[in-house]
Amino acid sequence: MNKQMKKIGFVIVTCIVSISLSAAGAEQAVQGTSAEVNEGPIVYRDLPYVTNGHQRQKLDLFLPRGQEKLPLIIRIHGGAWLGGSKEGEWPNDYLHFGYAVARINYRLSQHAIFPAQIEDCKAAVRYLRANAQKYNLDPNRFGVWGASAGGHLVALLGTTGDINEFDVGENLSVSSRVQAVADYFGPTDFLQMQAHRLPGGMDHNSPDAPESKLIGGYIQDNPEKVAKANPITYITKDDPPFLIIHGDVDPLVPHHQSELLEAALKKAGVPVTFYTVKGGGHGGFRDPNVPKLTREFFEKHLKAKE
């Protein structure tokens, strides 16, 4: 195994651990500050969102009891598109706040190259929307939340609501649009990552870099494939509101990636909140503003107005 592959393996583990710590910290910081769920949640595990599909094309759904027409938050895991699992996404805190929570797996880059990942995410959204009545979900209040590679995919969900190319397979009569996007430090423009990395940060120009593995070729040699995978390519004024959170000393995904996304969203007139975690790396945030801003964001955009 060469040095670059060893480093990528380390990166995947670092991504998963730091993202998990960040999510766990956010949930611990807000848990118990609202009314408790009367009973344990209703849990559906490993629902196949593609009939007879890949083993990764499954999701878990958590529903608080005694609720109807629930707003839904869909959690999408990170892991450099090479690793990670839905089991690393904790649903409990937002169940207490009156949300349904789904967490999805998707095909990784070793299973299929891009656009398989966004196709899977959209298939999961369509499955949940097509079955909204069955699960007491409000089909008009779907939010998505992800970090790192998951941040990239939720940003793509937000900016490609009007792009039919990525909607393939089943439940095509319903939309894959979402109504709110919480993007934690997701890549947004692969070809600008190297120039803005921190000293000693990850090498994004290697043919073995996660971004190259995602598109199935060296990113420098495939600008058209890169553009197709970049969330900023598709931004239009009708995109949903975004919350972007990023540490300013992230060694894996440069902070500049979120600066680019914020600027492009603002230019298009899309509502966006961008919060920089001072001294923050690739997740693992203990800044109390992170869970506060995230909860306020979803409350504003997914909870029914009185």
Predicted regions and their residues:
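N-terminal cap/lid segment of alpha/beta-hydrolase-fold proteins
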Residues: E27-Q67
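Mobile cap/lid helix-loop segments that gate and shape the active-site cleft of serine hydrolases
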Residues: S34-V37, N52, Q192-Y234, P240, ...
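Short beta-strand element of the alpha/beta-hydrolase
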Residues: K69-A80
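Short amphipathic alpha-helix adjacent to the substrate-entry channel of hydrolases
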Residues: S85-I104
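Histidine-bearing beta->alpha loop at or near hydrolase active sites
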Residues: S109-H111, V277-G284
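Alpha/beta-hydrolase active-site loop
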Residues: A112-Q133
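Short beta-strand/loop motif that positions the catalytic acidic residue
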Residues: D238, L243-H246, D250
